[in-house]
Curated annotation (Swiss-Prot):
Biological or metabolic pathway of the protein: Aromatic compound metabolism; 3-phenylpropanoate degradation
An MF annotation (GO) of this entry: 2,3-dihydroxy-2,3-dihydro-phenylpropionate dehydrogenase activity
Protein name: 3-phenylpropionate-dihydrodiol/cinnamic acid-dihydrodiol dehydrogenase
Lineage of producing organism: Bacteria, Pseudomonadati, Pseudomonadota, Gammaproteobacteria, Enterobacterales
Function, in words: Converts 3-phenylpropionate-dihydrodiol (PP-dihydrodiol) and cinnamic acid-dihydrodiol (CI-dihydrodiol) into 3-(2,3-dihydroxylphenyl)propanoic acid (DHPP) and 2,3-dihydroxicinnamic acid (DHCI), respectively.
InterPro entries reported for this sequence: BphB-like_SDR, Dihydrodiol_DH_HcaB, NAD(P)-bd_dom_sf, Sc_DH/Rdtase_CS, SDR_fam
UniProt gene name: hcaB
Catalytic activity field: 3-(cis-5,6-dihydroxycyclohexa-1,3-dien-1-yl)propanoate + NAD(+) = 3-(2,3-dihydroxyphenyl)propanoate + NADH + H(+); (2E)-3-(cis-5,6-dihydroxycyclohexa-1,3-dien-1-yl)prop-2-enoate + NAD(+) = (2E)-3-(2,3-dihydroxyphenyl)prop-2-enoate + NADH + H(+)
Binding site for substrate: 143
Alphabetized HAMAP family for the sequence: HcaB
EC category: oxidoreductase
EC number: 1.3.1.87
Length: 270
């Protein structure tokens, strides 16, 4: 039996991409899974696909009341909450400082930080009492942009660096009751969109990047799928497999940190 059997897991942005892969994986692990999802169509799809195995709540991660409504439903359904996974986010499609008008930069900053940083903070606030009671955990999705430049423009990169600070501070404030960690995936097959303020709300990340372009820059030389990143979340959520980690950010970058100066990887001819 899985360590996560009957564990109560709350994931934001579970309707597509990494969020959907996490929903699938935790259901496979036997967990009771809930998600807060902005899109009504995706909520309906989740309910149709997973039935009683999913509690799908329509709501916005920038709204504390929506979080609280979801947590109330989770506690009614499961009687507890064991793990909160803050995952919903938006990307800036590499919008640069020089080429982005000042007014757009300002409005884009507020929209992107509201989702990528405030959304995590509000989720932590809503979930903290239940997680303190269960001595559970929080896990936040980062990005390779939390470590390196060029994984987005200054707005996205700054938001992911802000999230690392949030993880460390929450890990400090909530210890010893709650473990707080992060996972930073690299580029993957996803429907990640951009801010409306930048005119990117209908533009998917895969319209800016190609599988070949992503694979070429990774030393492991493959195009990751969302399911490839779910393992670290499962490990961090497990009390048996993770008693000791808090304030830790797992850099799941397919080897970006070991790219060579002359070649992406030295073993390409092996």
């Amino acid at each position: 039996m899985s360590d996560l059997h009957n564990e109560s897991i709350f994931i934001t942005g579970g309707g597509s991409g990494l969020g959907l892969a996490l929903v699938e994986r935790f259901i496979e692990e036997g967990a009771q899974v809930a998600t807060l999802e902005l899109s009504a169509a995706k909520v309906a799809s989740l309910r149709q696909r997973f039935g009683e195995h999913i509690l799908a709540v329509e709501g916005n991660v920038t709204c504390y009341a929506d979080y609280q409504r979801a947590v109330d439903q989770i506690l009614t359904r499961s009687g507890k909450l064991d793990c909160f996974i803050g995952n919903a986010g938006i990307w800036d499609h590499n919008a640069s400082l020089v080429n982005t008008p000042a007014e757009t930069l300002e409005t884009g900053f507020h929209e992107l930080f509201n989702v990528n940083v405030l959304g995590y903070l509000l989720g932590a606030k809503a979930c903290a009492p239940a997680l303190i009671a269960s001595e559970g955990s929080m896990i936040f999705t980062l990005s390779n942009a939390a470590w390196y430049p060029g994984g987005g423009g200054p707005l996205y990169t700054a938001s992911k660096h802000a999230a690392t600070g949030l993880i460390r501070q929450l890990a400090y404030e909530l210890a010893p009751k709650v473990r707080v960690n992060g996972v930073g995936p690299c580029g993957m097959a996803s429907d990640l969109r951009g801010p409306q303020a930048l005119g990117q709300s209908e533009t998917s990340i895969m319209q800016s990047l190609t599988p070949e372009k992503i694979a070429a820059i990774l030393p492991l030389q493959f195009f990751p799928q969302p399911a490839d990143f779910t393992g670290p979340y499962v490990m961090l959520a497990s009390r048996r497999n993770n008693r000791a980690l808090s304030g830790v950010m797992i850099n799941a970058d397919a080897g970006l940190a070991i790219r060579g100066i002359r070649h992406v990887a030295a073993g390409l001819d092996l």
